[in-house]
C-alpha cells in the first residue's frame, strides 16, 4: 500500500468493503463507511442482508462516546395465530443434510434496516446520505460478478429466492439461478435508494412504498400500516464488561448474543490460558465446556427474561457454574447474516451486523427488496411459532463487538452464523488477545462449536484429537474435513501495537478488506 492508511473496512464481500473505503476517502467517518457498506451489501450480499431485514450498529466515537443502534425486526401489534396467515415450511439442501425453514408473508416482521441507517446517519454521519448510496446504486445498475460465496448462498436459498416472479427476475433472469462468474443486476433497487435519499425513511414507513408493501401482503400477513408507522430505532447503552484489563462493548439485551459472549469471557477469565496451549485437547475441552455452560445459562436464565430491566446485573453478577445442562434448541446451519467492521483515522469505530434471515420469499413489488422471515426463525422464537408478544423487539444472536484499551478501539469485530456467532467471536477474541496471534491468524485459526451435546471441530493438526477429549454428558464430536461457513464469518479490524490499522475478512465467507489512503 502506498501512502498513509487513514482507515480500514472489513466485510463479507470485496465490493462491500470497497464502498466503505470510498466514503473514507471522500472525507466521511467510520459510520458513513459502515452505512455505505451495508447498503452495498444489500446488492452484492443480497441473499444475506436486505433493507427488508434488520440489524445492530455498535459505535464508539473519537470523543469516547458509545452507542448501540438497535434496528432489528419488531413483531406485529396483533398476533392472529399461525393458521390465520401465509406461513409454510421450505426444505433446503445443505449438501446431503436437509433442513426446514419457515417462510411466507406470515413470517415477515417489521423491518428496521432503513430506520436504523437513517438514525445512525443523523446522529453520527458526516457525508450527505445521497453520497452514501452511490456505490450501491452503481453496483445495482452496472451489475456485479457473483463470487464463490454468492454462488453457494444463491444455490442453497434458491427455493426461497425464486418463490416469486420478482425474485426470479433478479436471481434467475434466464430461468436458472445465477452462478459464480455470471453478472447480476438490480436496477429497481437503485431507484429505491435514490427515492430514500430524496424523501428519507418516511417514504419507506409511512409513504408510497408502505402502500406497495401492504397491498402486496393483503390478508396473508399480520402486518398493518400502524406496525410500519410505529417502528422506532432503539438507541441503547452498549453492554460493558471487563476482560483481561480491557473493556468489552457489545450488544445488550433484549438481544442474547452479546451477553452470552460476556458470560463466556467471564468464565474464561478464571483460567490462565497459557496453561492451555492453543489447539491442544486441553484447550478444546475447556472452550467446549465454556460454550456448554453458556448454552445452559441461556436456557435457565435468559430465555423469557431478556426484556427484564435488570437482566444484565443478575446474569453477569453471579456464579452459574453449578447449573444443570438441559436440551439445547435447533441449530441454524446457515446463519444468513453479514458483518462490517470499520476504523477511521480519527479514532471512530463501527461494528455493524445485519440480517434478513433466510428471507420470506416475498419481494416488495418493483423494488428488488425481499422481506425477512424473522417470525419463521426457530431460534428467534424459542417458545414456538406465533407465540411472540405483540409489538415487541425480537431477540437476536447478532453481537457487534468492540474491545477498548484505555477507551481507544483496539479490536472491532462481529460475525454471521446464527448460534455460532458467539462462539466465533469468543474464539477470535481469545486467539488475538490471550494467544497474541496476528488478527489474520486469529480469524483463520480452526474453530469449534458446542451445541446440543454435539461438538463440531474444524480440521486440526493434532492427531486423534477426538480420542483425547473426555465428556461426561454424552457429547459426540465431529471433525470436519475443511473449514466451513458453519463456523461463522468474523470480519474484524484492529489497531496494532505500532499504532497502525489492520483488517481481516473471514475466508470462510469470502470476506474482504479495503484500506483508505491519504
UniProtKB/Swiss-Prot annotation:
Protein name stated in the entry: Glutathione hydrolase proenzyme
Subunit (UniProt): This enzyme consists of two polypeptide chains, which are synthesized in precursor form from a single polypeptide.
SUPFAM superfamilies cross-referenced by the UniProt entry: N-terminal nucleophile aminohydrolases (Ntn hydrolases)
TM region positions: none
Gene: ggt
Gene Ontology terms, MF aspect: glutathione hydrolase activity; leukotriene C4 gamma-glutamyl transferase activity
Biochemical pathway: Sulfur metabolism; glutathione metabolism
Post-translational note: Cleaved by autocatalysis into a large and a small subunit.
EC number: 3.4.19.13, 2.3.2.2
Homology family: Belongs to the gamma-glutamyltransferase family.
Record: active site: 337 (nucleophile)
Keyword annotations from UniProtKB, A to Z: Acyltransferase, Glutathione biosynthesis, Hydrolase, Protease, Signal, Transferase, Zymogen
Amino acid at each position: 500500500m502506498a501512502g498513509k492508511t487513514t482507515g480500514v473496512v472489513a466485510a463479507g464481500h470485496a465490493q462491500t468493503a470497497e464502498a466503505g473505503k470510498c466514503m473514507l476517502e471522500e472525507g466521511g467517518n467510520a459510520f458513513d463507511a459502515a452505512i455505505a457498506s451495508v447498503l452495498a451489501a444489500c446488492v452484492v450480499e443480497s441473499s444475506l442482508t436486505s433493507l427488508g431485514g434488520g440489524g445492530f450498529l455498535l459505535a464508539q466515537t473519537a470523543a469516547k462516546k458509545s452507542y448501540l443502534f438497535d434496528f432489528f425486526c419488531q413483531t406485529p401489534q396483533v398476533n392472529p395465530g399461525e393458521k390465520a396467515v401465509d406461513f409454510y415450511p421450505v426444505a433446503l439442501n445443505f449438501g446431503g443434510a436437509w433442513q426446514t425453514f419457515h417462510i411466507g408473508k406470515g413470517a415477515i416482521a417489521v423491518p428496521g434496516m432503513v430506520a436504523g441507517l437513517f438514525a445512525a446517519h443523523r446522529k453520527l454521519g458526516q457525508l450527505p446520505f445521497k453520497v452514501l448510496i452511490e456505490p450501491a446504486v452503481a453496483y445495482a445498475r452496472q451489475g456485479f460478478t457473483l463470487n464463490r460465496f454468492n454462488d453457494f448462498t444463491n444455490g442453497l436459498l434458491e427455493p426461497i429466492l425464486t418463490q416469486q416472479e420478482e425474485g426470479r427476475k433478479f436471481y434467475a433472469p434466464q430461468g436458472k439461478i445465477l452462478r459464480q462468474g455470471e453478472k447480476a443486476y438490480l436496477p429497481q433497487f437503485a431507484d429505491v435508494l435514490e427515492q430514500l435519499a430524496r424523501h428519507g425513511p418516511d417514504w419507506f414507513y409511512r409513504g408510497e412504498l408502505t402502500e406497495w408493501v401492504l397491498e402486496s401482503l393483503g390478508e396473508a400477513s399480520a402486518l398493518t400500516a400502524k406496525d410500519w408507522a410505529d417502528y422506532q430505532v432503539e438507541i441503547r447503552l452498549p453492554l460493558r464488561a471487563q476482560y483481561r484489563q480491557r473493556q468489552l462493548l457489545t450488544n445488550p439485551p433484549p438481544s442474547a448474543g452479546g451477553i452470552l459472549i460476556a458470560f463466556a469471557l467471564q468464565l474464561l477469565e478464571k483460567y490462565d490460558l497459557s496453561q492451555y496451549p492453543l489447539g491442544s485437547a486441553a484447550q478444546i475441552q475447556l472452550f467446549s465446556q465454556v460454550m456448554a455452560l453458556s448454552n445452559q445459562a441461556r436456557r435457565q436464565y435468559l430465555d423469557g427474561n431478556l426484556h427484564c430491566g435488570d437482566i444484565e446485573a443478575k446474569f453477569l453478577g453471579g456464579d452459574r457454574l453449578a447449573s444443570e445442562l438441559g436440551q439445547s434448541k435447533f441449530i441454524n446451519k446457515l446463519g444468513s447474516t453479514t458483518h462490517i467492521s470499520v476504523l477511521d483515522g480519527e479514532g471512530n469505530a463501527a461494528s455493524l451486523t445485519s440480517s434478513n434471515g433466510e428471507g420470506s420469499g416475498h419481494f416488495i413489488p418493483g423494488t428488488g427488496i425481499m422481506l425477512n422471515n424473522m417470525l419463521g426463525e426457530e431460534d428467534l422464537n424459542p417458545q414456538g411459532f406465533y407465540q411472540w408478544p405483540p409489538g415487541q423487539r425480537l431477540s437476536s444472536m447478532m453481537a457487534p463487538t468492540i474491545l477498548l484499551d484505555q477507551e481507544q478501539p483496539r479490536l472491532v469485530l462481529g460475525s454471521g452464523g446464527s448460534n455460532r456467532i458467539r462462539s466465533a467471536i469468543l474464539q477470535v477474541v481469545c486467539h488475538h488477545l490471550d494467544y497474541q496471534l496476528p488478527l489474520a491468524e486469529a480469524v483463520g485459526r480452526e474453530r469449534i462449536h458446542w451445541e446440543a451435546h454435539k461438538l463440531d471441530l474444524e480440521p486440526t493438526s493434532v492427531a486423534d484429537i477426538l480420542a483425547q477429549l473426555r465428556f461426561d454428558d454424552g457429547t459426540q464430536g465431529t471433525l470436519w474435513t475443511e473449514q466451513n461457513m458453519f463456523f461463522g464469518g468474523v470480519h474484524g479490524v484492529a489497531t496494532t501495537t505500532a499504532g497502525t490499522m489492520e483488517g481481516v475478512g473471514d475466508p470462510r465467507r469470502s470476506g474482504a478488506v479495503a484500506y483508505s489512503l491519504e
